[in-house]
UniProtKB/Swiss-Prot annotation:
Its main location: membrane. PANTHER family: IP12678P, SOLUTE CARRIER FAMILY 2, FACILITATED GLUCOSE TRANSPORTER. Residues 68-160, 211-212, 271-289, 363-366, 426-437, 502-514 are extracellular. Disulfide bonds: none annotated. The keyword Nucleotide-binding does not apply. It is found in: Membrane. CDD domains: MFS_GLUT_like (cd17315). Residues 1-46, 182-189, 234-249, 311-341, 388-404, 459-480, 536-567 are cytoplasmic. Probable membrane transport protein. This is Probable transport protein. It comes from the Eukaryota. It comes from Leishmania enriettii. The keyword Membrane applies. Keywords: Membrane, Sugar transport, Transmembrane, Transmembrane helix, Transport.
Amino acid sequence: MSDRVEVNERRSDSVSEKEPARDDARKDVTDDQEDAPPFMTANNARVMLVQAIGGSLNGYSIGFVGVYSTLFGYSTNCASFLQENSCTTVPNADCKWFVSPTGSSYCGWPEVTCRKEYAYSSPAEMPGALARCEADSRCRWSYSDEECQNPSGYSSSESGIFAGSMIAGCLIGSVFAGPLASKIGARLSFLLVGLVGVVASVMYHASCAADEFWVLIVGRFVIGLFLGVICVACPVYTDQNAHPKWKRTIGVMFQVFTTLGIFVAALMGLALGQSIRFDHDGDQKVMARMQGLCVFSTLFSLLTVVLGIVTRESRAKFDGGEEGRAELNPSEYGYVEMIPRLLMGCVMAGTLQLTGINAVMNYAPTIMGSLGLAPLVGNFVVMLWNFVTTLASIPLSYVFTMRHVFLFGSIFTSCMCLFMCGIPVYPGVSKKLEAKNGVAITGILLFILGFEVCVGPCYYVLTQDMFPPSFRPRGASFTQVAQFIFNLIINVCYPIATESISGGPSGNQDKGQAVAFIFFGGLGLICFVIQVFFLHPWDEERDGKKVVAPAIGKKELSEESIGNRAE
């Protein structure tokens, strides 16, 4: 009994000694909020520069997939070119100009041109042409164009590998992102990302020139390794260096600039792809256009190298550092203690990825093409909307808590997947093609609105706020690993699954797309229910250790001293 009383006395002493410090900390935070500098200060601008360059490189790498795949499809589709010189200069296909005695000359393939071999002259003949087309392994039926076509571009498995290769690299890179950023610091992390990005971009150019798919995949994997690092390093740097009053607002900018990078890729695709004159009698230089798309990847990588040279090192250090910098103890919390929050990080990652955003981002040209728009025009519309809607997250981050905005976005995007993009698109639900396409396109735009205003920007802030300051690099790294696992599953499986559910390449692709979005919506609703009950940002008073030995000669960095509460 006496031992127990003695322990209680010691505990009460330690608490009483600590409470004045906490009161002082809260007072300091209040003073910091009242005396906060304007938003546009030199220090905040430096932090925003990190978000701008890191986010833009990340976004362009994401948006690169759909545009490059579409341009590559043009470079392998002989049927698109209507004049002899443009036909014979197609870079990645063995196209031949056929001269017909009747005057209907055309560009086709030496072995078989499916649209000519299985042509039909009346609607009554279409079922027979479809059956003969499907019986020929060299051809596939297009339900949107209602004709037999030669396969062009990447197959569904190649598309999945192309989209998933960078994500596989990001998955591996994010495993080491937290420890790496803590050990070598932010500046060296950015420098390494930029240098590796330049190497990967050179591989893009080489792959384009030689039409070597494996070189492209290796380049994507390599840049993914260090994009996994930057997706952790940029939010952590912002959390540690932005002024507490503006930390949340600057934090959402990583997603804003990610969407800007995606938009730049879409804009380049529109400029390079829509300017191809298929009916012009001359070389359309499709390969040069593909090379032009790769140039911006090189540019953003070089800017990241410059960022690593000119940016300041983080104010927070782990286990030592320069005098005057806040010190964090990485051993304060272990993975076992953080299991509940790590699991909630996985659920957040599920909301981010398993509701289908990357299916929309990577396959927007294909999806919008199947809904009646020109692929690159549809892609541009989607990505422009994607960027514009993200801007609304900046003022919202200062008015509402990150948790509330994230939860609203979770339920909203899930409902859009189910009731706008999924069920109405399923064959037989809508008898009018225009109505089906109109509802689906509206659903995709509303889905992007909810994701980019609410889910995406808040996610990167919550990956910090979910964990205590000393655990944030490791916690954010773990959450990013989960996010990239889900991302990889979606990118690789989406094209393969939709094609298989549709009944193969010649099946009605609307069926597979509808089932996929119904699946996304269902998973999103499950994640939403879990998050309503268990998603709560870290609160030092509520969640922190109640008994902590005072550190001698060290500056403790608590939640109150590095940022305002998110809830």
